[in-house]
């Protein structure tokens, strides 16, 4: 009805606009008579707008009498032809109009507006009830509404229009931001979930119209709210929607502060909506209690569509409420086929009264996800029920923090194992926090092992208190389980069993994700390193399927670098989690080095590691060179701390890391040659060293057998020569195989010409042609469609051609686009994969061929050795190897230490059969590990240092020698368990010295001591051992028995007189070898003569009578230099081992400038003089009885040494060993020939001196002065040389004294020995003259016995004239 034909005058219309608002469009205006009390009527004007009706007075100025929204209408009754009664929520309005047509017009307008605002809904449904007499009138209206073309719905089903209408109905302000968010964000995401958190910033009242619109909206099917407290008004509106909407399917109100009354009202709302489509209900985190859930349960049984997803976790349920719920679920026949997700976690369900829940689970059902975590329900009872009802579909089973009711002495219920062995779909099993004894754990693992239906199972056994019993079960089962791809055994107290467990885990070929965190917290340092080494071997295994490793929250500190150093060359791990280990900036530095060469890692998690700005900068520098890492979450804990101390550097480094990660997501750059160079550097260098060693041995045999007759020998020689040529050519095997067929696939200047590139280029041209044709056809189709839709416009002349011509430029694609996509993106991906496969094949072929060469060379070596044995000749010494190694040494220095000589001998004595493909692979794996940085030596951990204190000062077995120090595995490593035992396997062997009769010299020396000392064997001369008590260290001793046994072979060939002379030296006093603080950076080096090695590996003895050279005393810096202590031989170690009880240690956490020092206690001069006088008397007595010859052979003469006072009040002893420059023992060839007999004598002397001797007392000074604090070394490993392992910390109060090796003194020397005041220089030279040969052996022992816990020691030495030379008597 237009305004011109309206019955309402224009003046009144203007007045009405002034009342209701001029912005509101008036659609219908009718004069009506409003019936009031009885038959009384009043003239009014009915004004209809798009969503509201107004009743105003019919006079000017008009006045608003009544208004109502169309949504308030509860019913319309038209019983009389011109009467219309409108019922609303507040009142009932009866109006009389001029004609029935006016009534129909009003109703038609209201229905049309409702249909336009709420498309998809019938106006009759919105108005609840429409009654018209006769009924044909309503039918005609319905036909009118249906015939009207419904305009296209707006975004999200026209939500914005509905929201505006609802705001008008409820009287709330219309928020344009709500309309924008829905029309833009929700439309873009194409989501059907209305999330109240998106509008949580608004007032709670503003949420009411948003929710109310869902009653009519047909787009949204899910209403969700999480962690948002909902007011009462909002809850009421939600209940209204539930009770009226048949479109809402999912209701998620998690942690919304709802109580029992809401659950009861929700049950009532469901009861009022028989057509409800609700099938997902999530009320987790709301204390609904048993009453509320019981009310809901009744309606769950009546839901027309059944329940698919039910989450009632943390709703304060008890077993009573769960049983009620289970009964209702069982009562609904649809539930068995519809319910797929059931979550009752977080409710206390302990006890046995859960029969209804077990019965429900035992019925055949379709549950896929079952969560009963943290309920304390019976694990075995649940599995028994699942066995009967949930085998077919159950995929996710979360039973963490439940209780296994198995008791000791009783068998595990068979149903427990049967469930895991019979399940058809299990993918994730979570039993974390459930205390599992070995029996149920074994049943679980065996059940999974024998289930061939399951694949890719994730098993979470974290915090199950498995401990040793569980570890043993895992060791016995895990290797054979084929269907576990993810295993979490963190926080299980497996510290003592991890070493063995990891070995068994490495045998499993299905585990791709492994979590071991929180199992190292209570682990001793001596047990930690073997575990990490085994873990490194596991991830380095070529066949290892492991892709993800987690060591989170293990508090490994710097020990985690053992794992990090293995990441650089690792090719299997794609994700590593080392967070919570406190590795510090040094760990970040090592991680940075690994990331620079790693091309496999995609995710690294490294928070909670005490990283500062410097560590972040190191990682940023490394990320610049890494193009493959994609995900490295910002370490929030460390970053927040670093930002407080150094914000600029930290922010800059973090920004760079994020930029490089973004670059890695966008770029396809792959350093193809980097992986090849890494493979070449590791494999080729390691393999070639092994081939070179065996080639040297074969070449020695070739040289010796070249002139021998015999066809067989000559044929073997020719075969060996051919093998040697192959071995030489194998050096270039990998490069030639990798580059075969031309250059690499991609160079620095881009792609090189190759068949693949040519094919891609031709393909690009073909694709471009096809694309152009498709685009032209598309343009033609568009223009045709436009002509069909707008034919009148398109009839104009030339418009079609103009449109096609104008669109041609816009629809074309640059010709280089397809080519760039194919060549620079897809092509690079293809070539990268080809390069990766090519390197894999080349490495495989090279490895197999080298294995064959090694095997052939080994057989050839054995054949040539057999020819020697048949000819009755001794095998020549492989001096060529030593000469070759010696020629390489002068690059660094021109002399070889005793330690290095022993190492050369050890390599010589390796049997050729040890050089096998297996040992080669071990060497390669060791080479792939980055050595531990020397920087760690500067750090000291007192707890770790104390763990290295030996209980017995005895020799560990020889085969374990240097297992930790050597990186290349020439000899297969022993099980790490043996390294934990501090007991020697020959401990109970009888001591040799107790079976021998003392010689005359020994008896003479023994007569001097007191009778008490003779009886108990524990007390010697009064002054013996005083200084050693305060100066000598007690350290862990490595085995040297192999050398003493070799020395014994010389004893068997010597005469009886020589035997007696050696025995006399065994009973004499010992010379305490004192060392000075040398200024040299390396320990003293001893030149050795070349002798044929003993079959038992005896150490070559140095010549006694070789030239002496004074060495410069050195001042050790606390940060860079090391002090080497001279140790006692094995014989004395064994005799003294049981007397030594404790070893004291001191903390070295102070600054390096205040270095700790070992020193000799400064004693009073009177006591020294008395001790010296007594010693001289004993020496004179011995000389008279034994004669000059015996005296010259006896080592009972006292030796004096000068001491240098240290800062701490102790004395630092000086030592001036001779340093001959010729490695064969003499400076000239003439001297070399003359020294040979003396060299033999020296060898025999050393052999005899290393035999066991009886223990001697160690007396303490009555009033000792304060000793300098001992130096405690700081870190287990060095980076310079694997052999330079310093001493372990020891007590200054216990000393082990070595027997003395001296040359025969001259008369002047003997006179000098009795002199009361020797000069300092003569004194030091005497020590040097008599002890340098002994020191060579002792120095090597010192090297082998040094603990892995030691680091550099440093101290200040006084070079000023304040140094005071003291006299001491050492016996």
From Swiss-Prot:
* Keywords, comma-separated and alphabetical: Acetylation, Cell membrane, Cell projection, Coiled coil, Cytoplasm, Cytoskeleton, Leucine-rich repeat, Membrane, Phosphoprotein, Repeat
Give the N-acetylmethionine positions (modified residues). 1
Instruction: Write out the biased-composition intervals (Low complexity).
Output: 1244-1265
Disulfides per UniProt? none
Region called Disordered, residue ranges: 957-1000, 1036-1159, 1172-1371
Keyword Metal-binding belongs to the record: no
> Which SMART domains does this chain map to?
LRR_RI (SM00368)
Coiled-coil residue windows: 710-734
Query: Example GO biological process term?
Result: actin filament organization
Region (Necessary for localization at the cell membrane) residue spans: 1055-1089
Q: In which tissues is it expressed?
A: Expressed in lung, placenta, small intestine, liver, thymus, colon, skeletal muscle, heart and brain. Higher expression in kidney.
Mark the residues carrying the PTM Phosphoserine: 122, 968, 1067, 1094, 1280, 1288, 1291, 1315, 1324, 1331, 1360
From the UniProt record, list the LRR repeat ranges: 245-269, 275-298, 304-327, 336-363, 391-418, 423-447, 481-506, 543-566, 570-593, 654-678, 958-981
State the family it belongs to.
Belongs to the CARMIL family.
Q: What does the record give as the function of this protein?
A: Cell membrane-cytoskeleton-associated protein that plays a role in the regulation of actin polymerization at the barbed end of actin filaments. Prevents F-actin heterodimeric capping protein (CP) activity at the leading edges of migrating cells, and hence generates uncapped barbed ends and enhances actin polymerization, however, seems unable to nucleate filaments. Plays a role in lamellipodial protrusion formations and cell migration.
Q: Which PANTHER family match?
A: F-ACTIN-UNCAPPING PROTEIN LRRC16A, LEUCINE-RICH REPEAT, ISOFORM F-RELATED
Tell me the domain comment.
The C-terminus is necessary for localization to the cell membrane.
Name used for this protein in its record? F-actin-uncapping protein LRRC16A
């Amino acid at each position: 009805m237009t305004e011109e034909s309206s019955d309402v005058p224009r003046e009144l219309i203007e007045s009405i606009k002034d009342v209701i608002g001029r912005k509101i469009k008036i659609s219908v205006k009718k004069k009506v008579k409003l019936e009031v009390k009885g038959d009384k009527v009043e003239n009014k004007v009915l004004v209809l707008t798009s969503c509201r009706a107004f009743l105003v007075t019919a006079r000017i100025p008009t006045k608003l009498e009544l208004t109502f929204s169309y949504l308030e209408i509860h019913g319309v009754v038209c019983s009389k032809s011109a009467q219309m009664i409108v019922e609303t929520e507040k009142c009932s309005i009866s109006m009389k109009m001029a004609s029935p047509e006016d009534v129909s017009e009003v109703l038609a307008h209201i229905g049309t507006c409702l249909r336009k605002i709420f498309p998809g809904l019938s106006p009759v449904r919105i108005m609840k009830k429409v009654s018209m007499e006769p009924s044909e009138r309503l039918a005609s209206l319905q036909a009118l509404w249906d015939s009207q073309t419904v305009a296209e719905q707006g975004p999200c089903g026209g939500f914005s229009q509905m929201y505006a209408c609802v705001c008008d109905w409820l009287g709330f302000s219309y928020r344009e931001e709500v309309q924008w968010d829905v029309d833009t964000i929700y439309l873009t995401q194409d989501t059907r979930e209305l999330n109240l958190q998106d509008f949580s910033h608004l007032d709670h009242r503003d949420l009411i119209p948003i929710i109310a619109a869902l009653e009519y909206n047909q787009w949204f099917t899910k209403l969700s709210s999480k962690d948002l407290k909902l007011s009462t008004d909002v809850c009421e509106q939600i209940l209204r929607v539930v009770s009226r909407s048949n479109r809402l399917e999912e209701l998620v109100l998690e942690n919304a502060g709802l109580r029992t009354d809401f659950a009861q009202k929700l049950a009532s709302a469901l009861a009022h909506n028989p057509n409800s489509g609700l099938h997902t209900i999530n009320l987790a985190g709301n204390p609904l209690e048993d009453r509320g859930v019981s009310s809901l349960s009744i309606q769950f049984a009546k839901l027309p569509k059944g329940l698919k997803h039910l989450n009632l976790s943390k709703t304060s349920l008890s077993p009573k409420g769960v049983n009620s719920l289970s009964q209702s679920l069982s009562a609904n026949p649809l539930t068995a086929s519809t319910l797929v997700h059931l979550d009752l976690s977080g409710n206390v369900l302990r006890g046995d009264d859960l029969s209804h829940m077990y019965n429900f689970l035992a019925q055949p059902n379709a549950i896929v996800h079952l969560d009963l975590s943290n309920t304390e329900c019976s694990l075995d009872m649940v599995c028994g029920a699942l066995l009967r009802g949930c085998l077919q579909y159950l995929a996710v089973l979360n039973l963490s923090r439940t209780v296994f009711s198995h008791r000791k002495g009783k068998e595990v219920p068979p149903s427990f194992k049967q469930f895991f062995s019979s399940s058809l779909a299990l993918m994730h099993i979570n039993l974390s926090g459930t205390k599992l004894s070995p029996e149920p754990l074994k049943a679980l693992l065996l059940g999974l092992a024998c289930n061939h239906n399951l694949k890719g199972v994730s098993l979470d056994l974290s915090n199950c208190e498995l401990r040793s019993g569980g570890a043993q079960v895992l060791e016995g089962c895990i290797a054979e389980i084929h269907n576990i791809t993810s295993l979490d055994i963190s926080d299980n107290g497996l510290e003592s069993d991890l070493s063995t467990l990891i070995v068994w885990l490495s045998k499993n070929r299905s585990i791709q994700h492994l979590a071991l965190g929180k199992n190292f917290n209570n682990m001793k340092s001596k047990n930690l390193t073997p575990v990490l080494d085994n873990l490194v071997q596991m991830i380095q295994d070529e066949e290892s399927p492991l892709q993800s490793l987690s060591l989170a929250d293990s508090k490994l500190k710097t020990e985690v670098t053992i794992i990090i150093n293995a990441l650089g060359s690792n090719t299997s791990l794609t994700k590593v989690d080392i967070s919570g280990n406190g590795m510090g900036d040094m760990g970040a530095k090592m991680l940075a080095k690994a990331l620079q060469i790693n091309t496999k890692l995609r995710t690294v998690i490294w928070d909670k590691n005490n990283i500062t700005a410097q560590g972040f900068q190191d990682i940023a520098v490394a990320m610049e060179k890494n193009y493959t890492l994609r995900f490295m979450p910002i370490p929030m804990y460390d970053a927040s701390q670093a930002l407080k101390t150094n914000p600029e550097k930290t922010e800059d480094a973090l920004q760079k890391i994020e930029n490089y990660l973004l670059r890695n997501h966008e770029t396809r750059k792959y350093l193809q040659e980097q992986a090849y160079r890494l493979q070449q550097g590791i494999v080729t260098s390691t393999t070639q060293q092994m081939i070179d060693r065996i080639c040297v041995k074969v070449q020695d045999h070739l040289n010796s057998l070249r002139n021998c007759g015999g066809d067989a020998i000559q044929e073997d020689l020719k075969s060996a020569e051919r093998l040697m040529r192959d071995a030489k050519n194998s050096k270039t095997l990998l490069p030639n195989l990798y580059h075969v067929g031309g250059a690499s696939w991609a160079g620095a200047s881009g792609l090189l010409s190759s068949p693949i590139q040519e094919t891609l280029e031709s393909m690009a041209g073909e694709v471009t042609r096809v694309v152009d044709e498709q685009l032209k056809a598309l343009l033609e189709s568009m223009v045709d469609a436009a002509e069909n839709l707008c034919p009148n416009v398109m009839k104009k002349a030339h418009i079609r051609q103009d449109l096609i011509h104008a669109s041609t430029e816009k629809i074309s694609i640059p010709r280089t686009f397809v080519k760039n996509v194919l060549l620079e993106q897809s092509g690079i991906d293809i070539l990268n994969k080809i390069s990766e496969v090519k390197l894999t094949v080349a490495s495989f072929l090279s490895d197999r061929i080298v294995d064959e060469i090694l095997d052939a060379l080994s057989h050839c070596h054995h054949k040539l050795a057999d020819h020697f044995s048949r000819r009755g000749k001794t095998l020549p010494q492989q001096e060529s190897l030593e000469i070759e190694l010696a020629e390489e040494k002068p690059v660094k220095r021109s002399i070889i230490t005793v330690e290095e000589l022993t190492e050369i001998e050890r390599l010589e004595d390796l049997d050729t059969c040890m050089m096998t493909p297996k040992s080669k692979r071990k060497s390669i794996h060791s080479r792939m590990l980055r050595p531990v940085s020397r920087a760690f030596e500067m750090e000291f951990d007192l707890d770790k240092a104390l763990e290295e204190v030996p209980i017995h000062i005895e020799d560990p077995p020889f085969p374990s020698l240097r297992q930790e120090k050597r990186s290349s595995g020439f000899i297969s490593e022993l099980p790490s368990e043996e390294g934990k035992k501090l007991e020697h396997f020959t401990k109970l062997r009888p001591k040799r010295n107790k079976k021998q009769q003392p010689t005359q010299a020994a008896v003479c020396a023994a007569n001097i001591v007191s009778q008490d000392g003779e009886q108990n064997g524990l007390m010697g001369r009064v002054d013996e051992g005083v200084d050693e008590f305060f100066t000598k260290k007690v350290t862990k001793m490595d085995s040297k028995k192999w050398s003493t046994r070799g020395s014994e072979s010389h004893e068997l060939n010597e005469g009886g007189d020589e035997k007696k002379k050696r025995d006399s030296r065994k009973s004499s006093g010992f010379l305490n070898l004192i060392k000075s603080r040398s200024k040299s950076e390396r320990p003293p080096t001893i030149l050795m003569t070349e002798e044929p090695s003993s079959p038992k590996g005896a150490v070559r003895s140095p010549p006694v009578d070789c030239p002496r050279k004074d060495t410069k005393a050195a001042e050790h810096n606390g940060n860079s230099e090391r002090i080497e202590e001279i140790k006692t031989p094995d014989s004395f170690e064994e005799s003294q081992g049981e007397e030594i009880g404790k070893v004291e240690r001191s903390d070295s956490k102070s600054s390096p400038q205040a270095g700790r020092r070992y020193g000799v206690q400064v004693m009073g001069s009177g006591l020294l003089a008395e001790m010296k006088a007594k010693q001289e008397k004993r020496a004179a007595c011995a000389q008279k009885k034994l004669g000059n010859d015996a005296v010259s052979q006896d080592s009972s003469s006292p030796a004096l040494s000068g001491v240098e006072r240290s800062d701490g009040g102790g004395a630092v002893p000086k030592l001036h060993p001779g340093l001959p420059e010729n490695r064969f023992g003499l400076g000239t060839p003439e001297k070399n020939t003359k020294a040979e007999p003396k060299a033999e004598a020296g060898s025999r002397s050393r052999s005899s001196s290393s035999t066991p001797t009886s223990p001697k007392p160690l007396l303490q000074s009555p009033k000792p002065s304060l000793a300098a604090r001992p130096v405690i070394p700081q870190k287990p490993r060095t980076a310079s040389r694997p052999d330079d392992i310093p001493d372990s910390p020891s007590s200054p109060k216990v000393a082990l004294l070595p027997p003395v090796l001296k040359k025969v003194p001259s008369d002047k020397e003997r006179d000098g020995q009795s002199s009361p005041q020797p000069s300092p220089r003569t004194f030091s030279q005497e020590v040097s003259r008599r002890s340098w040969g002994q020191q060579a052996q002792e120095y090597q022992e010192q090297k082998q016995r040094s603990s892995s816990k030691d680091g550099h020691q440093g101290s200040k030495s006084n070079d000023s004239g304040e140094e005071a030379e003291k006299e001491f008597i050492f016996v």
